[in-house]
Amino acid sequence: MFREVIPDLSQTAYVIAPDLPGFGESDVLLSVSFPAFGRAISELLDHLGIGQQYIYLHDFEAPVGFHIAMQAPERVLGLIVQNANAHQTRFGPQWAETQAYWTHPTEENQAAATAHLTFEGTRDQYLANVPPDVAARIPAERWEEDWRVICLPGRMDTQRALIAGYSRYVAQFDAIADYLARWQPPSLMLWGRHDAFFDLAETLSWMQALPRMEAHIFDAGHLLLETHSAPAASLMLDFIRRAKEKSKERVRA
């Protein structure tokens, strides 16, 4: 996901983009949960001696990122929000089957909530609702590799556990709102307007929670870095540089 932006970002920041446990090249955890993922990434950051940091929030990475941010808010230099949900009011109709599963975790509801865990559903992460001319810029190798990884031992179970566990993240939305209200971290939004999974209205909730948030809406889908990596990297570089300068000004004052 970050392959195209890491070279640019490394000009001004030390970039750490690990695969979450059970994703990519990372091993599967025996006990799968977003807090467990947060602890694993926190241990990695401590091992690397990382202090203050910018945190990228996207989809399943948002619960992990907030776990890290809320454990040590003084370390957060800024948030970069890219198609991530943190507000109860912004769940669209596409979440109905998942919410039904959270309320009534029957086998039937689980099957409906996880029906997208197929090759076609994996492809939809990239292409669903995306205009054809934009979708044409994404090579099929991307979702083919994702599907290969999902089919490895333990990976499908990881996906199912996270879908169920996302309800516990949703239950933390009030605490997240309190964190944002108290700390008001410098924030940059990069949002693909054609996302089939996260409602565009969520952008308003973010900006209401963070009135000084810088927001940019792209003609892209859920995985906007696949099609708009260059402008996204430029915006992130500018955001980090300005945040660094403001931090220096506060120190001098």
Regions found by a protein language model. Give the residues of each.
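Conserved HGGG/HGGXW glycine-rich cap/lid loop of the alpha/beta-hydrolase fold
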Residues: 1-25
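Generic recognition of short, well-ordered alpha-helical segments
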Residues: 1-4, 29, 201, 205, ...
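Flexible "cap/lid" subdomain of the alpha/beta-hydrolase fold that forms the substrate-access gate
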Residues: 16, 23-56, 60-216, 238
